[in-house]
UniProtKB/Swiss-Prot annotation:
Involved in the biogenesis of TorA. Acts on TorA before the insertion of the molybdenum cofactor and, as a result, probably favors a conformation of the apoenzyme that is competent for acquiring the cofactor. NCBIfam families: PRK04976.1. This is Chaperone protein TorD. InterPro entries: Chaperone_TorD, DMSO/NO3_reduct_chaperone, HscB_C_sf, TorD-like_sf, TorD/DmsD_chaperones. The keyword Transmembrane does not apply. It is found in: Cytoplasm. HAMAP family: TorD. Gene3D superfamilies: 1.20.120.1820, HscB, C-terminal domain. The gene is torD. One of its GO terms (cellular component) is cytoplasm. GO terms for biological process: protein complex oligomerization; protein folding. Keywords: Chaperone, Cytoplasm. Belongs to the TorD/DmsD family. TorD subfamily.
Length: 215
């Protein structure tokens, strides 16, 4: 690992990407809730909220997490997750890059193709880094959670320029469209806030990487 990548800033960046990835990867369960509401997590949320662009969405996430004080509340949030990200309908916001980047128009009633070009590209990126999608996560490699987890990895092990190019070519070119879809169809507050925070974070990180790469 180079001196450029092995520093506290990149470790912190990697942690944030990994957190965002984990929340898109699966429903919030009791274990995750405990981790997200621990004393250490509260300090993390407070620090993240110091950035004006993040504060509103962080405040919503913290408030919504505080409401998850029963099995029923967790089940309701899990239902929101399922309806948004696991069911491919007009009222969902499928978290796959290929659905937002495909050049082929999808006819009404047709199912967009998964495991397509973006999936193949991400699979190749993972192989190059000697990584793979975990077997218990049976999703295409262009799932947002996989892409965010990969950025968490390269934040630790590659140059700022390489990170900049990957984020620009594989994340920011579709993330805003996905977030707009979440905002349109989500009836709750948690996943809208999560999506908007993710977009704000990625855009902020891209600006930082750009300034670091040109300085």
């Amino acid at each position: 690992m180079s001196a450029e990548t092995a520093n506290p800033v990149n470790q912190a960046r990697s942690t944030i990407y990994q957190l965002l990835s984990s929340l898109f990867a699966k429903e919030v369960d009791h274990k995750t809730l405990h981790e997200l509401t621990s004393t250490q997590a509260q300090a993390f949320w407070s620090q993240l909220a110091e950035e004006p662009n993040f504060k509103a969405d962080v405040d919503v996430l913290v408030a919504e997490l505080a409401k998850l004080n029963s099995d029923k509340a967790l089940l309701e949030l899990a239902a929101d997750y399922c309806g948004l990200f696991l069911v491919g309908t007009n009222n969902s916001a499928s978290p796959y890059a290929s659905l937002y980047l495909t050049d082929t128009p999808v006819a009404k009633g047709d199912e967009p193709l998964l495991f397509g070009e973006q999936h193949q590209q991400m699979t190749q990126f993972l192989k190059q880094s000697q990584l793979q999608v975990q077997s218990e996560f049976p999703e295409p490699a262009d799932h947002l959670a996989v892409i965010l987890a990969y950025v968490a990895h390269i934040a630790m092990y590659t140059s700022n320029q390489q990170q900049l190019e990957f984020i620009r070519d594989n994340l920011t070119n579709w993330l805003a469209t996905f977030v707009a879809k979440v905002a349109k169809v989500d009836t709750g507050k948690f996943y809208i806030a999560l999506a908007q925070l993710t977009l704000a974070w990625v855009n902020s990180d891209l600006e930082w990487l750009t300034s670091e790469s040109t300085s």
